[in-house]
Structure formats: structure tokens, C-alpha cells
Design a protein with these regions (language model features):
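Glycine-rich phosphate-binding loops of nucleotide-dependent enzymes
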Residues: 2-258
Length: 258
């Protein structure tokens, strides 16, 4: 298949989502290419969180269309998204502080042996540790021993563990919700390096952030939501921070933002 005919990794069109009498999404649409980072921006209440929850299966859409690799897909539950290769790294990371790095990578999806007449299933620890090391090496993530409790890790290291867990399961698309929030300068730089490395390895990435400097450092495409609809989608190289801020705040007319 030629590059021109190759479908985009993800396309969302006309997404609508209501919570009772409140319409959270009224017309959301954007796309994500393989090997690229799409920054999803907007002020508080613009619909960013609802959009990623819709794609992740947490808050299924009421109307609209989601296409993955050119094919319409139905995502009604997080397990649907996982089966399609969509993983989300939420802001709280969902890590268990008392468990080690490897245990967190496989949390809820541990590899176990087949049952035998002589005893119960047992964890395949050696296999899990080997695969964990492979993924961490591929992503150039340097961490302490795999049995180190994540409670002892820095904020950047914890974020790295969550990202590694997201790509451990044959993922195609990784959604990141504010991955650099509350991180220091050095830790932020490392997480942004990870974001670009993911794209460089062929993953599609949706990045939610309020940091405009980070956006213009790592994003390939920028999509802006305002009041539940997409008001801007363009290549980062064709935009300026002022134009993006204007779309976010509503001081830039939608026609001018398109």
C-alpha cells in the first residue's frame, strides 16, 4: 500500500457525548498518524478528558464515528480499547506503590503457567522480568532493580513505568493525560524524550497538556477543543503559540482557526 493510500491510525468524526442534560461533546473530530504526536488542547471544560475517555471506552460516545486504521470500530468498554491496541496513561498513573516495577508493568495481566494435576498455576516471573527489561531497554528507560517498589521512585520514573506498561501489550495508540504535570525540569525533559521515542518507534500518541512549550517541542499536529467541539486542527509547523492560544480562549474566530 502506498503512503498516500495508507489510512491514518486514528480518525474521530462528529463525536457527541451527553451526561443527562449536559452536552460534553458536540462535534469533536481529529486524526492521529502512525509515528506522530497529536496534541489535544483546550481550556478546562473544553472536552479533552471526555474525548480521551470516549476513545478509551470509559465514556462511550452517543454519536459519531471512530476509525482505527481506516476501519470503523465500536468502543463501549475499556477492554474494547485494549483489544484494539489503545492504551491510556491517566494523570494518576494507576500504579500500586507497594509493588515493584515489574509487578506494576504486569498488574492485572500477570503471566501464569497452565494448571497441572500437581498444583495451582504459578507466576512466570522469569518470563515477565525478561520482557519487562526488553521493553524498558527499547524505550531507553533507566530504572532501579525490577523489584524496587514504585513508591521509592521519582515522579519522572513513575511516569516512565506507566508509559512502559502502556506499550507492553502490542499497543498502537498511546494516550497521555498531562504526563509532565508536577514534574521538575529534568524529569519533564525525560518524559518528553519518551513521547518522541514512542512516535519514533511507530506508535501514535495523543498528548493532553496545558504547557505550550512542551506542545511545540514534541507535537506534529495540534487539535484544539473549545466548548465540546474542535475549533482547530493543523500541523504544528503551520501554527504559532498565539494562534493556538487564540483558538483555546475563543479570541481567534473559528473560521480563521481552520
Amino acid at each position: 500500500m502506498s503512503a498516500a493510500a495508507d489510512p491514518k491510525l486514528l480518525v474521530v468524526r462528529g463525536l457527541r457525548k451527553r451526561f443527562g442534560a449536559v452536552t460534553a461533546l458536540r462535534n469533536v473530530g481529529f486524526s492521529v498518524e502512525r509515528g506522530e504526536v497529536t496534541a489535544l488542547l483546550g481550556d478546562n471544560g473544553a472536552g479533552k478528558s471526555t474525548t480521551i475517555k470516549a476513545i478509551a471506552g470509559v465514556a462511550p460516545i452517543d454519536e459519531g464515528e471512530i476509525l482505527l486504521e481506516g476501519h470503523p470500530v465500536t468502543i463501549r468498554h475499556p477492554s474494547d480499547a485494549t483489544a484494539l491496541g489503545i492504551q491510556t496513561v491517566y494523570q494518576d498513573l494507576a500504579l500500586c506503590d507497594n509493588l515493584g516495577i515489574c509487578a506494576n508493568l504486569y498488574l492485572g495481566r500477570e503471566l501464569v503457567s497452565r494448571p497441572t494435576p500437581f498444583g495451582p498455576r504459578v507466576l512466570r516471573d522469569v518470563e515477565m522480568e525478561a520482557e519487562a527489561r526488553r521493553v524498558l531497554k527499547t524505550l531507553r528507560i533507566n530504572l532501579p532493580a525490577l523489584d524496587t517498589p514504585v513508591a521509592s521512585l521519582s515522579g519522572g520514573q513513575r511516569q516512565a513505568v506507566a508509559i512502559a506498561r502502556a506499550v507492553l501489550w502490542d499497543s498502537k495508540l498511546v494516550i497521555m493525560d498531562e504526563p509532565t504535570a508536577a514534574l521538575g525540569v529534568a524529569q519533564t525533559a525525560e518524559v518528553l524524550r519518551l513521547v518522541r521515542d514512542l512516535a519514533g518507534q511507530g506508535y501514535g500518541v495523543i498528548l493532553i497538556t496545558h504547557n505550550m512549550q512542551n506542545v511545540f517541542q514534541v507535537a506534529d499536529t495540534i487539535a484544539v477543543l473549545r466548548l465540546g467541539e474542535t475549533v482547530l486542527e493543523a500541523r504544528r509547523a503551520d501554527l504559532t503559540p498565539d494562534r493556538v492560544v487564540g483558538a483555546i480562549t475563543g479570541t481567534l474566530a473559528i473560521g480563521a482557526a481552520a
